[in-house]
Amino acid sequence: MTDAIWNQGYTQNRELSWLEFNARVLAEAEDETVPLLERFKFLAIFTSNLDEFFMIRVGSLTDMAALEPNRRDTKSGLTAEEQLSRIYAAVEPLYARRDAAFRDVDARLAQEDLCRTSMDELDSSERKYIKRYFNTMIAPVLSPQVVDSHHPFPHLEGKVLHIAVLLSHKKNERLGLIPVPASLPPITFLPNDKRRYLMTEDILLAFADSIFEMYDVLEKTVFCVTRNADVPLDDEPFGSEQVDLRKKMERMLRQRRRMAIVRVELSRPVSSHFKECLHKRFEVTDEQIFLSRSAPLRMSYAFSLGDYLSDGRRSRLSDPPFIPQQPAMLPAGQSLLKTALQRDVLLSYPYESMEPFLQMIREAANDPPVLSVRITIYRLASKAKLVEYLCAAAENGKDVTVLIELRARFDEQNNIDWSERLEEAGCKIIYGFEDYKVHSKICLITRRERGGVRYITQVGTGNYNEKTARQYTDVSLVTSSESIGMDAAQFFNNMAMSNLNGRYNRLLVAPTSLKNNILSLMDGEIAKGSDGYILLKFNSLTDIDMIEKLHEASCAGVTVEMIIRGICCAPPASHPPPADRPDRKSVV
């Protein structure tokens, strides 16, 4: 049915669907009912999301266009080249929307005494201050370069701001480059005035003429390149005894820094001549160069800008602070570990705190009857109490096994570092499978009791990340069910033995049983016809079999509702939806 389903409009391209998701993030920044500082943060999130999209998805399609030009996407029938063309066309207006939203937010912040200022707006004393600041704090850490036969074009690190300057000397043109050091703060406030600030790259632009004082400066712009980050692991066998996956990942991260450029962003319009010069140097096409006319190319400072306001004003311009509550099923001060031995506990993040789970691991680390703790880890906070408690458990003589997924996108280095810390403490570290990422969120505590052992199992939908548990909606079940515990024990044994085809009584485990069982449950609702009901909540929906089954259910009269955060390859229907399409809701 795959060909027919896209020809009939029942599926859509995943990349274009992702851009629609990010457009919804941008819409939050455009919404005047959203507090001003939150709007600015949404602009920064939109920008960061788009960076990762180009690094991974556009990077992957660029490779595919070169290696498999005739291969067509199963959900839209488009080749990689056709997908890239549509992506570039869809992204261009998003830049314009971001610029407009930034101009509005920036103007409103100025009214709240947070004013982004240009060099042209400074008086003479302020100019003198910025010149001293440049000479003492910025110039000493700069590494400018003029590209010529003796100074070849350097490697440009991705997502790092640079200044490009078109220079002239004795009728010969040269390209000058100034990397913006990461050690410099993104913004600088004027002296005795915590209301007006300049962007560091704007200061560098202003002093580019003095940096290249031997040349005439013809044009200049801030730019940033985005590199393909979709790097496959090398050809060494994944399970080779001679090769530690951690070492392979470290090599992959080094390789990622030198991959092809897939996007160039400019901060101001440049002449066609200068643009052509950049084309040749970066080896990109015209449609891969994007212009940000108003918004800074990097906006991470949005998350700390409010710190310069008074407490009262910052509160007025921000969402009310969200504080997760004590779980309703667990009275304050009560041990989750001991409670779970008596009854199941369901935690709902972020509405309820993750702290009881963390304290359960801490308690297990110091509980004499606890024999072992086993857990899967995909993403962790940069400062993780969970790691501290797992290390304590190992140091206290518990058998601690951690299955840590080193290939969690853009968390690779973080996970490498944590795996080393856990291993040093005596934890047994395993990495998973060659062709699959381990995305399960499961923890098993084994406890010796009179007459045998008891299991306490936690199964959840969200990462063991103390930061994102305050932001993302997830559920976490903690149970002492013997059958679930036995399944969990078998799961960890299978992971340690690289056995994907384990058999389980209660747990549904991808890729062998999760999808088939969900499709079977949906068949049961299809058999009920108009009395059937299906409610699904996803991060993303891209699976063709699932989309076809949802289409089948809708055609059978089943009421189908979906709540989807990100990509949805089943296109939106009108509301109420026609009989052959499920109803979907998108959340940000």
Language model regions located:
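Hydrophobic alpha/beta core scaffold segments
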Residues: 559-563
